[in-house]
């Protein structure tokens, strides 16, 4: 069973760390190759993984507007194929591609359509795909990226974060996001757990609560020192909590129809709005 999932949420809730830990979890299980996609315009997944990148899909899109019109036929597609392949950061067990900033002014129809074809072919070479997405779902909603099996919306343990998660879910509905199932992860939960106020906010999202990830001092120390997720101990509470969720998703112990509402019924039956 392959996983194609995206972590989405407002900046600062820890979705990039969770994305990096997910990639590491898959590689550690021998589930390579994995494609890591940084779809946040403020790219920092590479830092969490401890790698560097030189080119972005956004840069390729800009180059396509200026350079491709002078090419003919297959040369256009070959140009984009070569550029995307060159943009891949190849690591042990996974490759990383950085989407970069959204398009600027002007017509990008050809570039987007051609890139979509290139990325679709590229994605078929991988067993699993993990997308680190910003709350605006820019690259996913524009169909620059493929259909998702899971949209995992990440919040921190704050009312503002959970309300943003709800808006992300609303946006996913508005743009008919190509995601099979979705759910909520509340990150950085204190030892006392979720307050009653926060529980009510979670219920109001209409999203199933898939997991709570504990506030982990080891992650705070890791971030403070600029270290990568490899520095997080195997028994770190946050790592163990996320691993438990990934096990359930990967092994199919929760069927998508029972664990998370499908796109046809994204809010489930309890949403009365």
Label the model's feature ranges.
Residues 2, 61-71, 232-233, 252-255, ...:
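N-terminal regions of ATP-driven nucleic-acid and macromolecular assemblies
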Residues 3-41:
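Walker A/P-loop phosphate-binding motif and the immediately C-terminal alpha-helix
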Residues 4, 36, 94-96, 209-212:
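Conserved beta-strand scaffold positions in the cores of enzyme catalytic domains, especially
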Residues 28-92:
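N-terminal phosphate/diphosphate-binding loop that engages ATP/GTP or pyrophosphate donors
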Residues 67-70, 99-103, 227-228:
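Short glycine/proline- and acidic residue-enriched helix-loop micro-motifs
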Residues 78-86, 90, 95-133:
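Cytosolic-facing regulatory segments adjacent to core modules
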Residues 110-212, 221:
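Conserved catalytic-core segment of NTP-binding enzymes
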Residues 173-273:
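C-terminal lobe/tail of nucleotide-utilizing enzymes
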């Amino acid at each position: 069973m392959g996983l194609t999932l995206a972590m989405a949420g407002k900046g600062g809730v820890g979705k990039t760390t969770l994305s990096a830990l997910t990639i590491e979890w898959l590689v550690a299980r021998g589930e390579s190759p994995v494609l890591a996609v940084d779809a946040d315009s403020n790219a920092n997944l590479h830092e969490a993984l401890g790698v560097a990148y030189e080119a972005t899909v956004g840069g390729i899109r800009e180059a396509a507007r200026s350079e491709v019109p002078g090419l003919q036929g297959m040369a256009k597609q070959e140009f984009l194929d070569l550029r995307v392949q060159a943009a891949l950061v190849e690591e042990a067990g996974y490759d990383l591609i950085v989407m970069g900033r959204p398009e600027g002014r002007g017509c990008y129809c050809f570039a987007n359509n051609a890139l979509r074809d290139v990325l679709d072919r590229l994605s078929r070479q991988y067993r699993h795909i993990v997308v680190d997405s910003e709350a605006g779902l820019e690259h996913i909603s524009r169909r620059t990226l493929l259909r998702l099996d899971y949209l995992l919306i990440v919040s921190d343990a704050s009312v503002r974060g959970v309300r943003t998660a709800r808006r992300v879910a609303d946006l996913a509905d508005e743009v008919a996001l190509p995601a099979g199932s979705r759910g909520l992860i509340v990150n950085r939960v204190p030892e006392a757990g979720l307050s009653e106020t926060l529980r009510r906010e979670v219920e109001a999202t209409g999203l199933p609560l898939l997991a709570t990830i504990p506030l982990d001092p080891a992650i705070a120390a890791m971030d403070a020192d600029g270290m990568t997720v490899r520095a997080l101990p195997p028994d770190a509470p946050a790592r163990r909590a996320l691993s438990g969720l990934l096990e359930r998703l990967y092994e199919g112990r929760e069927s998508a129809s029972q664990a998370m509402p499908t796109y046809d019924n994204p809010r489930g039956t309890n949403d009365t709005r």
